[in-house]
Amino acid sequence: MEPQLNQEVINTAALHDGPIETDAVIVGAGPVGLFQVFELGLLEIKAHIIDSLAYPGGQPIELYPDKPIYDIPAIPVCTGKELTDNLMKQIEPFGPTFHLGQEVSVLEKQEDGRFFVETSKGTKFLTKTIFIAAGVGAFQPKLLRVDGLDKFDNSQLFYRVKNPADFAGKNLIIVGGGDSALDWALNFVAEGPNKAESVILIHRRDGFKAAPANVAKMKELCDAYEMQFIIGQVTGYDEKEGRLTAAKVTGADGITRVVPLDVMLVFFGLSPKLGPIAHWGLDIERKQIKVDTEKFSTNIPGIFAVGDINTYPGKKKLILSGFHECALAAFGAAPFIFPDKKIHLQYTTTSPKLHKVLGVESPVFD
C-alpha cells in the first residue's frame, strides 16, 4: 500500500544533459532519509533523494504499511503508511527531488572535493555531500525458484500487492508463511470490493512466522471452506497459450498436486543487499557503516550515514534514533556546503528565519 503523494513533492527529476549539481544527495527514502530532508532544509540545504523502490517510505511501507508503530515520540500510534504520509507533508516546504526505482551504481570523489554519483538509470550528480540512509540496504524480493516461471512476472506472478483491486474476483494462490502471506490471504477472503473468487494458501510446513491471531483466523476460514491451505512447495506449473493456468505443488508425501489459478502471489520476504555501497571504500563492519557520533560522518569526509545502515557503540536500530542522527549529520555537513558561514542553532518555535523557510507565519505574542 503506497503512501499518499503530493505530485509537486514526489515529482521525479527529468533526464538532464549533464550532471545535476546539488549540495546534498540522500541515498534512501525511508523515514530517516525523509527526515534528513527536513533537517537539511532547516539549514537551507536542498537535497535530491535516490531510492531503489518505486515510492518513498522504505521498510515501513514495504514490510508493514498497515501495522501499528507505537514508539514515535508524541504519536501514540500510527501505521507505516501514516508515518510516511506525515513525513512527506513535513518536507513539502523544502521541495526535495526524488529519483525512484534506481540505485547508486557509481560514486567517485572529484578533485574539487565534490562527489560524482551515477544511478542504475543513468542519472548523474555532482554533490558536495552524501547522506546514506539506506536502512539495511536495497530491498529485493526473495524469488520463487521454478525454471521458466519468471516469464509470468508482473502479469500473473507477483511479489507484492500494489493495488488489491487488481486481484478481486480472481482465483489466487498465495505462497508463503509469514505475516504478508497471511495478511493478504485474509484480506482477499474477506467480504468487500477486493474479495477474490478463491484463495489457496501454500506453505512448506504447518508452522508459520506470523501473528498467532491471523494463523488461527486462517484455520477457521479453512474449516468453514472459505479458503484452503495446502502444505507443500511449488515445484512446477502448467500453461496454456502463454497463460499460467496451474501450479504443481509437491507435498511432504512426495505427491504432486495440480492447483488451478489465475494469479500467484509469493511472499518469501525481502532480502536486503548492501549492493554497490560495499565497494565505496567506507569502513564497514558486519554490513553496517561505522560512524562517529558527533556528526555521523564516515571515514570519507563529506559522506554521512544515518539510520539502520550505520553502527557505533550503543547503536539501537530505532526510527527515533535515526531522527536524532539526522539533526547532527545536517549540522556536520553544513561546513562542506557553507565553508565561510557560521551555523547557529535556531528553534522552530521562535526563529523568524525558520518560519520563513517553513512557509509559516511567525507568531505574535502580547
Swiss-Prot record:
Judged by the first EC level, this protein's enzyme class is oxidoreductase
Paste the cofactor note. Binds 1 FAD per subunit.
Q: Which residues bind FAD?
A: 51, 59, 64, 104, 139, 308, 349
Give a GO molecular function annotation for the protein: ferredoxin-NADP+ reductase activity
As its record notes, the protein acts as a catalyst of:
2 reduced [2Fe-2S]-[ferredoxin] + NADP(+) + H(+) = 2 oxidized [2Fe-2S]-[ferredoxin] + NADPH
Does the record's keyword annotation contain DNA-binding? Answer: no
Q: Which domain of life is it from?
A: Bacteria
| Pfam families in the cross-refs | Pyr_redox_2
Family membership, please give it.
Answer: Belongs to the ferredoxin--NADP reductase type 2 family.
Record protein name field: Ferredoxin--NADP reductase
Native species of this protein? Answer: Polaromonas naphthalenivorans (strain CJ2)
